[in-house]
Amino acid sequence: MRFLAPLLALLLLGGCAQLNAFKDLAGAITDKIQGSDNAEPPKELQPLEPTVNMSVLWTTQVGKGSLGRILNLMPAVTATTVYAADHKGAVVAVERASGDVQWSKDTGLEIASGPVVAGDKLLFGTSNAELVAISLADGALIWKTALTSEMMSLPRVSHNLVIARTSDGRIAAFDLGHGGIKWSHERTLPPLSIRSQGSPTLHGDLVLDGFGAGKLIALNLQDGHLVWEATAVVPRGRSEVERMVELDADAMVQGDVVYATGFQGGLSAIDLRNGSILWHQKTAYTSHATALSRKSLFITDTNSDIWSMDITNGADQWKQDVLHQRRLTVPTRVKDYLVVGDFEGYLHLLRADNGSLVGRLELSGEDPIVATPLAFEDVLYVLTSDGLLAAV
């Protein structure tokens, strides 16, 4: 899994233990997350004659990037403008067509997630347990709301409500206009849990979110009451590590089906109407988001192998391991292709129907691409860990 050492530093241990016991547990989790081949080096890139060419349209610098931290910084795009931020609070608005900077603002925030466009506002979560809204026009502060703990997930917006998940397991709704709290849902985290960057999924009047013990919940958007709870995977095993099951990836919805995956959680299809399990497969899992097409679901697993699975039953359609252990991003769909970034600053283009590699672009020399590339009108917007924002 990407960023293993920082993830281990973020483990939540209930009741806890002596230091030596913690070290043993951390070592076991290291092996479990990275897999039995954790010492295996990333595959070297082989010569490629591209059949589809990618080129850089423009680049600009966004502060200092993530400063080596595990954050959820991603570009946000509108019809005219691309917005991005760094961890130390630098926010820039860039003209989408030319890459010219329209405005920049030093907010002073320790930004952990965002930005997300919501009407005339940009929304962020911070490492200092804040949900913040600034002006889309010039970056001026509109409101700031205190949370119960840091916010690693992206804010979600629907019906004038901002849904925020914090790392202590709470989900809360806030008024988009002034930041006042509307409701809060608290859940009990399992004794051992990995702090997740996954974000709630909003669909109709439901808030969908996965967490430990293999559970996915649906809350009512307006008042936060529990509509249903599904146990997609029953934790099994003799050790605490073997029993860790986190549905921590963003849930995906198509029709009346929600697809959920996460650490040691396999992939599950769940009936959106009542939470019943339609099917479950154990072949692959990811702690990051997935991509959907009409017939397939695409994931980058913990070994950076890319899978295509049938959305009707979870059957494998293809697997691509040519980029094994290259710390890939979540796949992004662009027409008939998938795009992933890697730890050396390369973008890779694959055919969605068979997984074959058809294009490659070195975006920035050895500067990792960790944020999911964002596609808008056949242009990709990519933010590297050092703060390079590029249109491709």
Write out the residue ranges for each language-model feature.
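Short coil/turn segments within WD40 beta-propeller repeats
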Residues: 89, 129-130, 169, 214, ...
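C-terminal motif of bacterial Sec signal peptides marking the signal peptidase cleavage site
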Residues: 13-15
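Short loop/turn segments that connect beta-strands within beta-propeller blades
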Residues: 95-98, 135-138, 175-179, 221-224, ...
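Blade/loop signatures of beta-propeller domains
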Residues: 30-59, 226
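Extracytoplasmic beta-rich repeat domains
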Residues: 20-29, 51-76, 103-118, 141-158, ...
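Structural signature of WD-repeat beta-propellers
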Residues: 86, 126-127, 166, 211-212, ...
